[in-house]
Amino acid sequence: AGSYLLEELFEGHLEKECWEEICVYEEAREVFEDDETTDEFWRTYMGGSPCASQPCLNNGSCQDSIRGYACTCAPGYEGPNCAFAESECHPLRLDGCQHFCYPGPESYTCSCARGHKLGQDRRSCLPHDRCACGTLGPECCQRPQGSQQNLLPFPWQVKLTNSEGKDFCGGVLIQDNFVLTTATCSLLYANISVKTRSHFRLHVRGVHVHTRFEADTGHNDVALLDLARPVRCPDAGRPVCTADADFADSVLLPQPGVLGGWTLRGREMVPLRLRVTHVEPAECGRALNATVTTRTSCERGAAAGAARWVAGGAVVREHRGAWFLTGLLGAAPPEGPGPLLLIKVPRYALWLRQVTQQPSRASPRGDRGQGRDGEPVPGDRGGRWAPTALPPGPLV
């Protein structure tokens, strides 16, 4: 057949139709008057034999077709090129779990972030309540058209306010009744309220400071604020999604992120957003001359050091329609073009679950508290405050 095709190429009609000009399949069919011979010519004419490169992996078989190929996968494998084991999770596959994936003996299973439920295909995730995490309303997050007002914050961004009404730190709404912030911020004042983007103020009835927080070193500088009543979704705000470390490392961190936080403009805290990309620990450590631990992460963004950031800002990443929290800004970054060092929130996923799922045992907030090193907080009056110990169990 090969020699026959070669001879035909130099016959006037086929040479004119298919080599001097681009021909269509029907024109070649008129020359050969035979489907099998036409198909063999057409595969060569349209790019040769794709199966020659052995694109089907894991012992899959390949069948050439016009302008392409088709793989038949061996048992236990699937995907266009048979690259995916049916029992394993593969972050790069487009037809896999929309949110979280768990490998199994025969097949993987999917689950969804808070407020989402599995679709009929058992892979997609659909918001099913008003407080579904990581969703953005139509009002988010640009300036009102024709207005010079401040940029609207993400719906999970909140401010921390003291008893005198002064905003002093930022925080992140991770559930309708829990705000994540730094332990340092949570210890600054005894009386704390949370102010949402709609200027609703919610009293903090208790605080959970990580039991391994070290004020001197800044290790484990995280705290959860337990709100006296939940945020009214979606008007007052929406929580961001949280993720485990494996999902964050393999799926989220390779993607670009957004640092959404608060910066100082005079005495006012105004929202600011900055596109960031993940920086590998070794590179970040060299740039900052610091040790990057498993509980910290680095991000790089243009002119990040030019703004006066307030602690409690958050790095979020969008994945298939939902926004996930990957980093918490613990302190103002140094001036200059260097990367930002943040608290790696997914490393605290177990601690977050322990706190949010237990009965409320947080420290009550009086009008007078204990500052760091046990000194009274100036300007506040009333009761006493101390960090809450978590129930026995593993800590991350």
Swiss-Prot record:
Protein name, per record: Vitamin K-dependent protein Z
The gene coding this protein: PROZ
Residue ranges constituting the Gla domain according to the UniProt record: 1-46
A single MF term (Gene Ontology): calcium ion binding
Residues carrying covalently attached carbohydrate according to the record: S53, N59, N191, N289, T388
Organism whose genome encodes this protein: Bos taurus (Bovine)
Example of a GO cellular component annotation carried by this entry: extracellular space
Disulfide bridge map: C18-C23, C51-C62, C56-C71, C73-C82, C89-C101, C97-C110, C112-C125, C169-C185, C284-C298
Any one of the GO BP annotations: proteolysis
Residue numbers of 4-carboxyglutamate PTMs: E7, E8, E11, E15, E17, E20, E21, E26, E27, E30, E33, E36, E40
Compartments in which it is found: Secreted
